[in-house]
Amino acid sequence: SDVCSSDLNYYGIMIDISHPSKEAIKQMIELSKAPVIASHSSARALRDHPRNLDDEQLNWVKENGGVVQTTALGAFLTDRKDPPPNMDDFMDHIDYMVGKIGIDHVGISSDFDGGGGIVGWKDASETMNVTAALKERGYSESEIEKLWGGNLLRVLDQVQEIAAKMQAGEL
């Protein structure tokens, strides 16, 4: 709702759109004065999963200045069981979203605490495999920095700046 979005903006809390309905996501983005994040969602165009974002939703996040963090949760990446979801599936979602909404609006999420993990990135000890796969796909060091947290930190800074302006009565 508008009250909730306004309160979250006022206190500098990032709004996460990963679980709500499409209509609720649209409303939250429209009502937020700050960029939003999808902390663990992938591309519905590649895997029709209800938690993934469709192209229209991806564009809403881009227009809002936010970030969508694709997640290494196999069920969000593919419906294929054999072979099990792997690094190529994960990279395909990153590539798709970067192509669709730009490098500044995409990030990486493991979702290890929610059952995440794929062949090649089952736990934190295999995290370097993600960076290696990004390099193999042609991403530059600066692009990899954005994907690994730079974009999320940018949004956090913007959320904090908007909160400060709201608290000062400037917004």
Placement of each model-derived feature along the sequence:
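Distinct, well-ordered alpha-helical segments
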Residues: 21-34
